[in-house]
Regions:
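Active-site-flanking segments in enzyme catalytic domains
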Residues: 1-119
């Protein structure tokens, strides 16, 4: 796929765990786990874009440097287009909704749920 061909030499299914996230960012991946293979990278781009706040995403792009940030942006564009064309999902609208809901979570209630406390 087009996505897999962007940084094929940067994927390492064995040594990805030794990379820091910053090293992965500089290689054009949004997480060190995403640098393990293209399929994981694809999902990590989408998942992290949806759940991480703007400050995290902006910091990642800044720390990635010009080359890493350009690669991440290229990957994001592919993910965004794919979701829109294949699933009719507006990634920005989905992210906005997830971000809004995350702000309104009652963490105290969630942490007190019986299944989380092993009961």
């Amino acid at each position: 796929t087009e996505f897999a061909q962007i940084t094929p030499a940067n994927y390492d299914p064995i040594k990805w765990q030794e990379r820091t996230n910053k090293e992965a960012w500089q290689l054009g991946c949004v997480t060190n786990y995403g640098s393990s293979e293209a399929r994981e990278d694809f999902v990590e781009v989408i998942a992290n874009y949806i759940v991480k706040p703007d400050a995290w995403w902006d910091n990642m792009l800044r720390e990635a440097g010009d080359e890493g940030a350009a690669i991440i942006q290229q990957k994001w564009e592919i993910c965004n287009t794919w979701l829109e064309e294949k699933w009719e999902i507006d990634l920005d609208a989905l992210r906005d909704e997830v971000q809004k809901r995350q702000q309104n979570l009652d963490w105290e209630m969630i942490m007190n749920l019986e299944f989380l406390n092993g009961k």
